Amino acid sequence: MLISLRNSLLVAALVCAGFVQAADLDKGKEINGTCAACHSDNGQGGKKGEYPRIAGQQIKYIETQLRNFRARTRVNIPMFPYTQERELSDEDIKDISAYLAGIKLDTKMPTYTGTEDALTRLLMAEKVMIIPRSEGDLANGEKIYQKQCAGCHGKTGKGKGMFPMLVGQYTNYLQRQVDLYLKGDRPHDEEGTVGVLNGLKAEDIKDVLAYLTSIQETEQ
């Protein structure tokens, strides 16, 4: 009993002192080689939102979704071979999530000094992601977002904790996820299909998505 207590105290001390094993970013980068086929090398996603942006996403959100794919509690057939059959370990999930969360995509084209070669310029430009503005009533979108969405997703849409970043994400991808929530094909947190989204009109959702495209420049 005394030994067990001492061991527990030792573990607690190590955790407090920061000795918990950190994510292996090199391993995460290696795993991303598989993800890049759909989501691109820098995690921008692709095919105009058929594959979502995952770069800069909240680490806890990425971890949770990968575990959901692996357990098949979130249905996404293209993801099954990479999570279930490959048997993505908890450690792998931790590593790839940390790697992706650390990728920063600018919302403005880089300023070149004139000393860069062509390859360097190309690599710099590839780390830029600008979501086209979508149409909608920005004032209404801001009002609804700040009142009903910001509490979880943050005032600037960057997300927090297990709640995902929305700003900088493809508009048609976000709309597709909203549709899945409303149909009950994807649970919205613990609400199921009952909650904020069900109380919004289609025009309100359009306005919120338009508002999100208008504030991406603040993501610096």
Regions found by a protein language model. Give the residues of each.
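The canonical Cys-X-X-Cys-His
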Residues: 33-41, 96, 141, 148-155, ...
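Short pre-active-site segment immediately N-terminal to redox-active cysteine/selenocysteine motifs
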Residues: 24, 31-34, 42, 58, ...
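Axial heme c-ligation environment in periplasmic c-type cytochrome domains
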Residues: 47-55, 68-114, 160-165, 182-220
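Bacterial N-terminal signal peptides
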Residues: 8-17
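The feature marks the first
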Residues: 29-72
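Terminal helix-turn-helix DNA-binding modules in bacterial transcription factors
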Residues: 177
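Electrostatic cytochrome c docking/interface patches
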Residues: 18-32, 45-50, 113-144, 162, ...
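Bacterial N-terminal signal peptides that target proteins for export
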Residues: 1-9
